[in-house]
A protein has these predicted regions:
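Low-complexity, glycine- and small/polar-enriched segments
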Residues: 1-192
Length: 192
């Protein structure tokens, strides 16, 4: 049993290789991150369960801890943050995204400032939000960056289906987000 006490608590179970048939309960608010370097195998023998608030209340309005499970290693969250939290990386809306390497349709500095205010009591300006964010522990940063990642995947799917949109039939935006968080090569250009 893992007990989170605060909405910003992030409990982690990390294995360099495999996690097999883990039976884990998490009580309270916050997050549980389960990450396997290779395989996360649960089948019908393992479970990851959020039990909710231990006193029966819903202090955050969202109930118990969220659970994030990943296998195959961690994403490159630092590179993802550099791309999606810097307004200098915003693409020219009049040009095709595929022709603008290193650019993205949307950057999330406004959403970052709002999230910091809501989750961490941040009172600074939007311009100072990135420095505040960079000083947070990596597990706290990942909570926000996963939200950005899923927002980009959702937007990419919607753009694909918008026949009147600039990227109709193209999942470029979603593929770009996936490639940034989970690159195919390491920093030296070797395949991962």
């Amino acid at each position: 049993l893992i007990l989170n006490q605060q909405p910003n608590d992030v409990s982690r179970i990390v294995a360099g290789r495999d996690i097999l048939y883990a039976n884990v309960d998490v009580a309270g608010p916050g997050w549980l991150e389960v990450s396997a370097g290779r395989n996360l195998t649960q089948e019908d023998r393992g479970r990851l369960t959020s039990l909710g608030m231990i006193d029966g209340s819903q202090a955050t309005g969202r109930g118990g801890a969220g659970i994030v499970a990943s296998a195959g290693g961690e994403g490159d969250y630092a590179a993802f943050a550099r791309r999606y939290l810097d307004p200098a990386n915003r693409a020219d809306a009049g040009q095709p995204l595929a022709g603008q390497p290193g650019k993205t349709v949307k950057t999330y500095e406004g959403e970052l400032a709002d999230w910091l205010r809501q989750q961490h009591g941040y009172t600074g300006s939007a311009d100072q939000a990135r420095a505040y964010f960079d000083a947070l522990p990596a597990e706290q940063q990942r909570v926000f960056l996963r939200q950005v990642y899923y927002a980009e995947l959702t937007a990419g799917g919607r753009e694909y289906n918008d026949t009147a949109g600039p990227r109709a039939g193209s999942y470029a935006r979603g593929r770009q987000a996936i490639a940034e968080l989970y690159p195919a090569t390491d920093a030296q250009g070797r395949p991962i």
